[in-house]
Amino acid sequence: MRRPTRLLAFVLACASTAIVARAQSSTTPPKPGPEVRKLAVMVGKFTNEGEVKAGAMGPNSPAMKVNGTDECRWTAGGFGLTCTYAYDVGGTKWAGTGLFYYDSTSKKYRYHGVNNLGEIEDQTGTVSGDTWTWTGESSISGKVFHILYVTKVVSKDSYEYTESWGESENSMEPFMGGKDTRVAISKPATSKPAQ
């Protein structure tokens, strides 16, 4: 009768050791990979200047200037970006928050956002060279629109964008376009000691 008890005690001791060893090895958090680090192009504060195309907000709607700011910061240990924006679009204030991250399972980038107009966006992105392409859906007041959003990095501090919308993927038309420019971070003035 002692043999099964000893064997059971031995098996439990080995299992406990394996569990403890595994727990100790997993205390070092993983580091973001190169795909995640590509999101760094969006980190910082940017000014946005653009235009909503004539007719984009309904028949005979005029073109409207877009001005505002975007700001993105690393979150979740550097695995994603939390971004906020505040725009004036033809006198209407748009403000929202979004989350960008890399999904290693699908090998695509993801974006989820919400704004003060009740719009909810869900997009999937890819990057090729300096061009990011985002496709997905946006729902406003229960109506779903398809979106194509393309950004082209033109320098380390700016990118140009175009956005198209439609009720189906085949009916998308240009909605807006413009340019984001990184705001230079001012360095604090340094004073020299009195002589």
Predicted segments with their positions:
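Bacterial N-terminal signal peptides that target proteins for export
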Residues: M1-A9
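Bacterial N-terminal signal peptides
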Residues: A9-A18
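Sec/Tat signal peptide C-region and signal peptidase I cleavage site
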Residues: I19-A23
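Hydrophobic small-molecule pocket/channel-lining residues, especially in calycin-type beta-barrels
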Residues: Q24-Q195
